[in-house]
């Protein structure tokens, strides 16, 4: 972590200028496979520390726009909400007499995410086209697996912030 701090201090002005000019290019994410409880494998895309910092800046920009639009019953990847909160809400519903629930998983959702559809949806609420282009660059930045970089024409790596 100390090394990245030194890197950012030394290159801060150049990085900020590249971001402002729209010339910032994220690095490909590093592919990591982790086992799933059902025996399958989940492929994660781990961004560089530098890109994580930039993704956090994008997240801070998007959260105030999108957070008010989400359902009160949505808990995943939400600020101030946890799996423990979701379990507590299920308990509350059970105590109120509810006996049915729905578990939903969209298979391969992150692997097949259509970039253009996502970007067009984002444009409905994000007026700054630079933010849209930054997100597009992340989506298209590629995945490095076993030292080989593969292009990403669809999908979004799980593991980053965006």
Model-assigned labels for residue ranges:
Residues 3-25:
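Amphipathic alpha-helical blocks
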Residues 1-2, 35-44, 71-73:
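Glycine-/proline-rich flexible loop or hinge segments
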Residues 41-70, 154-162:
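Conserved pre-motif C helix in the palm subdomain of viral-like polymerases
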Residues 12, 16, 29-31, 41-43:
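A common structural microfeature
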Residues 18-23, 27-32, 37, 72-73, ...:
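Conserved polymerase palm-domain catalytic core
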């Amino acid at each position: 972590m100390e090394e990245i701090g030194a890197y950012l201090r030394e290159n801060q002005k150049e990085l900020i200028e590249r971001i402002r000019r729209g010339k910032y290019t994220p690095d490909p994410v590093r592919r990591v496979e982790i086992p799933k409880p059902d025996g399958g494998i989940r492929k994660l895309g781990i961004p560089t520390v530098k890109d994580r910092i930039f993704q956090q800046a994008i997240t801070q920009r998007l959260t105030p726009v999108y957070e008010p639009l989400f359902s009160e019953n949505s808990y995943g990847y939400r600020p101030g909400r946890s799996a423990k909160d979701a379990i507590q809400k299920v308990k509350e519903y059970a105590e109120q007499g509810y006996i049915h629930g729905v578990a939903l998983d969209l298979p391969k959702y992150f692997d097949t995410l259509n970039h253009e559809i996502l970007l067009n949806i984002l444009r409905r609420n994000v007026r700054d086209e630079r933010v849209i282009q930054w997100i597009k660059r992340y989506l298209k930045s590629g995945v490095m697996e076993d030292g080989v970089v593969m292009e990403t024409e669809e999908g979004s790596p799980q593991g980053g912030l965006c």
